A protein has these predicted regions:
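A structural motif
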Residues: 30, 66, 99, 104, ...
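C-terminal helical cap(s) of enzyme catalytic domains, especially alpha/beta-barrels
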Residues: 249-266
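Active-site acidic/histidine proton-transfer and metal-coordination neighborhood
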Residues: 55-67, 77-175, 180
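Active-site mouth loops of central-metabolism enzymes
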Residues: 3-17, 75-89, 117-123, 187, ...
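Acidic/histidine-rich catalytic cores of soluble enzymes
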Residues: 10, 32, 71, 129-228
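Short, acidic/polar
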Residues: 14-25, 84-97, 189-200, 222-226
């Protein structure tokens, strides 16, 4: 089975109503849609969305032949405030229930920021506990919960030990295609520019991938190596286009990204 291509409803798609989102995703050749939540996007998929609307979303997406690639919550768990973490847990738990009702097997959440002060270990312990509990909730429905390698967790020296500490078979990491070639602290891309050491760290926990501006000359060689490694491993998960383009011709731009994806994945 080949890798699949999904449209994350980031900036390019954030103002499209559901019907237009589906039309654009189909026209550009995506296999699925990754519904980004918590920003009030026009698709209307939110933790507290009306149940009737969520049923409509499922019916329309199913009828289109597209898949629900991910229910993507922006709930994060770095706060030292118990009430704030509890609120984030509630939103994430609702996202798991939405994924179950959609027939979606993936929910993404965030870590997200780890301080460099005396609270560091407490924050990491809190995040680990929350991730383990969410994975436990999702497990009976066959749903994978993933933390994105975002914020402080672009550093594999933080993300990978946390994934190991969660120690749940349905928990993993979304690689956010941050290759850390210019990192000032923590793990940094080696001088030869190969991403292999980074890939080898996160690969055992990899569930999905987010891509950004793959066409940039300074990024393209790293994406080429990433896809070579994925193909050599036979990885067949979802790769998302987290598109930030907001210009006048999104359909053309998304089609070009689709062509680039298929070229790299071939």
């Amino acid at each position: 089975m080949a890798m699949k291509w999904s449209l994350n409803t980031y900036q390019t798609a954030q103002n499209w109503e559901l019907d237009e989102l589906i039309r654009q995703a189909k026209a550009a050749g995506f296999d699925g849609i990754e519904f980004l939540m918590d920003f009030g996007q026009k698709h209307g998929v939110e933790a507290n969305a009306d149940a009737a609307w969520l049923r409509t979303v499922k019916e329309k997406v199913d009828a289109s032949g597209l898949e629900f690639a991910s229910v993507t919550s922006c709930a994060s768990f770095h706060s030292l405030n118990d009430a704030e973490r509890a609120e984030a847990m509630d939103r994430a738990a609702k996202s798991i229930r939405i994924a179950r009702d959609f027939g979606c097997q993936h929910v993404r959440v965030l870590g997200d920021r780890v301080p460099e002060d005396g609270t560091r270990e407490t924050v990491l312990e809190n995040i680990t506990h929350c991730m383990r509990e969410l994975a436990r909730q999702a497990q009976p429905d066959g749903i994978t919960v993933s933390m994105e390698m975002h914020g402080s967790f672009t550093d594999p020296n933080l993300a990978v030990p946390l994934a190991e500490a969660v120690e749940m078979p349905n928990f993993g990491l979304v690689f956010n295609s941050q290759f850390r070639e210019n990192a000032q602290t923590g793990w940094r891309l080696p001088p030869d520019g190969s991403i292999r050491p980074l890939y080898d760290r996160f690969r055992p926990h990899l569930t999905q991938i987010h891509t950004h501006q793959m066409e940039r000359p300074d990024q393209f060689p790293m994406y080429q190596e990433l896809f070579r490694l994925l193909k050599a491993d036979g990885w067949n998960g979802y790769v998302a286009m987290e598109a930030a383009y907001t210009g006048p011709d999104p359909e053309k731009v998304l089609r070009l990204y689709t062509a680039l994806f298929h070229t790299l994945a071939a």
